[in-house]
């Protein structure tokens, strides 16, 4: 493991995998005026942070450097990241550290459930690092976490954001059997950018994963998201929409890629709010129940409100 100085994010020193540490600096253009967020300094933010730390939990909000952390934590909305803070992959866009993860904390599902109760969450989002080192990719741990939340907070709806469980036979079935309300798996980018942006993954495996969820349990909402500004073309984004609809995915998110450090993939360009609005309009015409497309859209941003909209959209279709 190599430690390099992180000169962009608020956390100045983070362990970096040699694959990232040895990359030349990649410079991005200055951020435009439409990408601005408030500093996280409210009382609600502080209270959420305290509960997270008291329960010894990791959040993707912190580890991935999410720009919406101030807004979400002020409302007591946090996305819990299970199975540690170290990922077995080194995706070029991601700020989560890479290395050999430690053993899974067997009590973590209970800690997540208790934090969900303390925060009074009506809708909780749980994600994880990639755990290619585990036989099932962490699928059973996901299932245990879902069951623990159900037991302690029966009224809380549960959304999960999973890795791809690549080459982990039977893993997906374990997670789906636990019956989350929303199953999210992000494609992250268009197929042509996978080699440089997400080299450890396979685009059509991810499409098939989402399709398989619906085949096993059609009642579960499925969701996926991509980042733009990584060098993709508009027609490629539209093709991703078609691929997701062919897999019967309900909810699409599209957000601007923001470079975590100079050792990460550069921002090729900043997509304008008008372009995001156009993507949203087109996506709805293709049949998605819910679409969120804006510069600061992230997978878990407004997840609770969006879940209510998903339910309403499905109810309208079934009339």
Swiss-Prot record:
**One CC-aspect GO term:** cytoplasm
In the record, which residues are listed under signal peptide?
none
Q: Which cofactor does it need?
A: [4Fe-4S] cluster
Localization recorded for this chain is: Cytoplasm
Q: Which residues are noted in the entry as [4Fe-4S] cluster 1-binding?
A: 61, 66, 72, 300
Question: Region annotation Disordered: residue ranges?
Answer: 5-31
> Does the keyword Cytoplasm feature in the UniProt annotation?
yes
Q: Does the keyword Transferase apply?
A: yes
**Which reaction(s) are listed as its catalytic activity?**
[[Fe-S] cluster scaffold protein carrying a second [4Fe-4S](2+) cluster] + N(6)-octanoyl-L-lysyl-[protein] + 2 oxidized [2Fe-2S]-[ferredoxin] + 2 S-adenosyl-L-methionine + 4 H(+) = [[Fe-S] cluster scaffold protein] + N(6)-[(R)-dihydrolipoyl]-L-lysyl-[protein] + 4 Fe(3+) + 2 hydrogen sulfide + 2 5'-deoxyadenosine + 2 L-methionine + 2 reduced [2Fe-2S]-[ferredoxin]
Q: What is its main location?
A: cytoplasm
Q: Which residues bind [4Fe-4S] cluster 2?
A: 87, 91, 94
Q: Which domain of life is it from?
A: Bacteria
Instruction: Please name the SMART domains in this protein's record.
Output: Elp3 (SM00729)
User: What HAMAP family does the database record attribute to this sequence?
Assistant: Lipoyl_synth
Protein name according to UniProt: Lipoyl synthase
What organism is recorded for this protein? Nitrobacter winogradskyi (strain ATCC 25391 / DSM 10237 / CIP 104748 / NCIMB 11846 / Nb-255)
* Chain's gene name: lipA
């Amino acid at each position: 493991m190599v430690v390099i100085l992180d000169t962009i994010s608020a956390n100045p020193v983070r362990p970096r995998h040699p694959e990232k540490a040895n990359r030349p600096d990649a410079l991005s253009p200055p951020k435009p005026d439409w990408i601005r967020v408030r500093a996280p300094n409210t009382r609600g933010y502080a209270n959420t942070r305290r509960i997270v730390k008291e329960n010894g939990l990791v959040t993707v909000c912190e580890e991935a450097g999410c720009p919406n952390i101030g807004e979400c934590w002020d409302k007591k909305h946090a996305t819990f990241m299970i199975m540690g803070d170290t990922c077995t992959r080194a995706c070029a866009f991601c700020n989560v550290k890479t290395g050999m993860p430690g053993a899974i904390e067997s009590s973590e599902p209970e800690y997540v459930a208790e934090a969900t109760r303390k925060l009074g969450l009506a809708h909780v989002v749980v994600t994880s690092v990639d755990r290619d080192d585990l036989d099932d990719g962490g699928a059973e741990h996901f299932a245990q976490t879902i069951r623990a939340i159900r037991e302690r907070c029966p009224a809380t709806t549960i959304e999960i954001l999973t890795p791809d469980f690549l080459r982990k036979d039977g893993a997906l079935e374990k997670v789906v059997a636990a019956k989350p309300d929303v199953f999210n798996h992000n494609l992250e980018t268009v197929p042509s950018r996978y080699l440089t942006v997400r080299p450890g993954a396979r685009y059509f495996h991810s499409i098939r994963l989402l399709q398989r969820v619906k085949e096993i349990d059609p009642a579960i909402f499925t969701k996926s998201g991509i980042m733009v500004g990584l060098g993709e073309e508009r027609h490629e984004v539209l093709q991703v929409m078609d691929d997701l609809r062919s897999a019967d995915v309900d909810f699409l998110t599209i957000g601007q890629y923001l470079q975590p450090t100079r050792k990460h993939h550069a921002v090729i360009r900043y997509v304008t709010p008008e372009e995001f609005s156009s993507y949203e309009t087109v996506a709805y015409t293709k049949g998605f129940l819910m679409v969120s497309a804006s510069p600061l859209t992230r997978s878990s941003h407004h997840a609770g409100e969006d879940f209510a909209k998903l339910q309403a959209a499905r109810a309208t279709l079934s009339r």
